[in-house]
Amino acid sequence: MNDLITNLALPQEVINAAGSNNGAGIGYGLVAVGAGLAMIGALGTGLGQGVSAGKAAEAVGRNPEAEAKIRLMMIIGMGIAETAAIYSLIIAILLIFVY
């Protein structure tokens, strides 16, 4: 019964690719999707760093005397936020090259 549903739902080329062991099967496709989803972490990091830099520029505009402290806190915050993007990149690379 399962073969009947598979044969009706999928073209023969897809079934052959899923059964082959040449790296082009559904398993590798799911790995690629997982790597892409892992890189969504970089999207959040980029947005967060952009907001952080904008707010720091506003704060320096309102209080120029505190520019050194504001810049230091912004750089520390961006460094902490960047670790999420680095971890996402490592996971994506591991998914692609280890599988």
UniProtKB/Swiss-Prot annotation:
Which GO MF term does the entry hold, naming one? Answer: lipid binding
GO cellular component terms, alphabetically, are:
plasma membrane; proton-transporting ATP synthase complex; proton-transporting two-sector ATPase complex, proton-transporting domain
Compartment(s): Cell membrane
Major subcellular site: membrane
Keywords assigned by UniProt, alphabetized: ATP synthesis, Cell membrane, CF(0), Hydrogen ion transport, Ion transport, Lipid-binding, Membrane, Transmembrane, Transmembrane helix, Transport
Q: How does it sit in the membrane?
A: Multi-pass membrane protein
Q: Which cysteines are joined by disulfide bonds?
A: none
**Record-annotated membrane-spanning stretches:** 23-43, 78-98
Q: One Pfam family, short name please?
A: ATP-synt_C
Site Reversibly protonated during proton transport: which residues?
E82
What is the documented function of this protein?
F(1)F(0) ATP synthase produces ATP from ADP in the presence of a proton or sodium gradient. F-type ATPases consist of two structural domains, F(1) containing the extramembraneous catalytic core and F(0) containing the membrane proton channel, linked together by a central stalk and a peripheral stalk. During catalysis, ATP synthesis in the catalytic domain of F(1) is coupled via a rotary mechanism of the central stalk subunits to proton translocation.
- What family is this? Belongs to the ATPase C chain family.
Assembly, in brief, is: F-type ATPases have 2 components, F(1) - the catalytic core - and F(0) - the membrane proton channel. F(1) has five subunits: alpha(3), beta(3), gamma(1), delta(1), epsilon(1). F(0) has three main subunits: a(1), b(2) and c(10-14). The alpha and beta chains form an alternating ring which encloses part of the gamma chain. F(1) is attached to F(0) by a central stalk formed by the gamma and epsilon chains, while a peripheral stalk is formed by the delta and b chains.
Full protein name: ATP synthase subunit c
Q: Which gene encodes it?
A: atpE
